């Protein structure tokens, strides 16, 4: 049964503006250490896609970025085949457990001006 659904669209120009202004500090504020390590350079598409997943995930959880859930507690990791997977930590993980979440589905897409992500949370 679906217990959460979230969608988010991020304008690449907004991320580019933040990177220009704040550089690596911006990326470190919104990406987990593992996401930072997986990023070869500070790329707008990578950061925008990951941020869209984070926003979609907290919408699916029904919390937004509140209740102790910050961007670094929601991360996107790739399987060996490159498929994006959601990994939650801390308050985000506890919220998912409270909802009975047993599986998460993630999709990310980009075009010239935006990144979009969809997150579906399922429970048995």
From Swiss-Prot:
GO terms for molecular function: holo-[acyl-carrier-protein] synthase activity; magnesium ion binding. The keyword Electron transport does not apply. It comes from the Bacteria. Keywords: Cytoplasm, Fatty acid biosynthesis, Fatty acid metabolism, Lipid biosynthesis, Lipid metabolism, Magnesium, Metal-binding, Transferase. Coiled coil: none annotated. InterPro entries: 4-PPantetheinyl_Trfase_dom, 4-PPantetheinyl_Trfase_dom_sf, ACPS, Ppantetheine-prot_Trfase_dom. It catalyses: apo-[ACP] + CoA = holo-[ACP] + adenosine 3',5'-bisphosphate + H(+). GO terms for cellular component: cytoplasm. Its EC number is 2.7.8.7. GO terms for biological process: fatty acid biosynthetic process. The keyword Iron-sulfur does not apply. Its cofactor is Mg(2+). Mg(2+) binds at residues 8, 55. Its main location: cytoplasm. It is found in: Cytoplasm. Transfers the 4'-phosphopantetheine moiety from coenzyme A to a Ser of acyl-carrier-protein. Belongs to the P-Pant transferase superfamily. AcpS family. NCBIfam families: acpS, pantethn_trn, PRK14657.1. This is Holo-[acyl-carrier-protein] synthase. It comes from Desulfovibrio desulfuricans (strain ATCC 27774 / DSM 6949 / MB). The gene is acpS.
